[in-house]
């Protein structure tokens, strides 16, 4: 169960970061303020919820195990940037993502 909460905390944190990115996207001048407030508001909600879930994780897992699991954020952000905004991800970056996933698996199996 704590693993599910950890993944959800990670996803919400990433959701908040992606909302911040979306808030910076160019728009016509007329809707800029509303666009900015919407995405920054969503970012705050996501990051606030992530923080609450993260506190639950820290009550259960040692911080030395839990914190490295947040490396999942790098994986989620890379995938989202690639899929949502069609950002180019070089092979070297994908190798880094694979190494992060490997590290998470190794650390997770030690928990």
Swiss-Prot record:
Coiled coil stretches, renumbered: none
SS bond list: none
Topology term for the membrane: Multi-pass membrane protein
Domain EamA: 40-109
Pathway noted in the entry: Bacterial outer membrane biogenesis; lipopolysaccharide biosynthesis
Keywords: Cell inner membrane, Cell membrane, Lipid A biosynthesis, Lipid biosynthesis, Lipid metabolism, Lipopolysaccharide biosynthesis, Membrane, Transmembrane, Transmembrane helix, Transport
GO molecular function, one term: carbohydrate derivative transmembrane transporter activity
Keyword Lipid metabolism carried by entry: yes
Gene3D superfamilies, sorted: 1.10.3730.20
Entry keyword annotation includes Kinase: no
Function: Translocates 4-amino-4-deoxy-L-arabinose-phosphoundecaprenol (alpha-L-Ara4N-phosphoundecaprenol) from the cytoplasmic to the periplasmic side of the inner membrane.
NCBIfam families: PRK15051.1
Name this polypeptide is given: Probable 4-amino-4-deoxy-L-arabinose-phosphoundecaprenol flippase subunit ArnE
Species annotation: Salmonella newport (strain SL254)
Lineage summary: Bacteria, Pseudomonadati, Pseudomonadota, Gammaproteobacteria, Enterobacterales
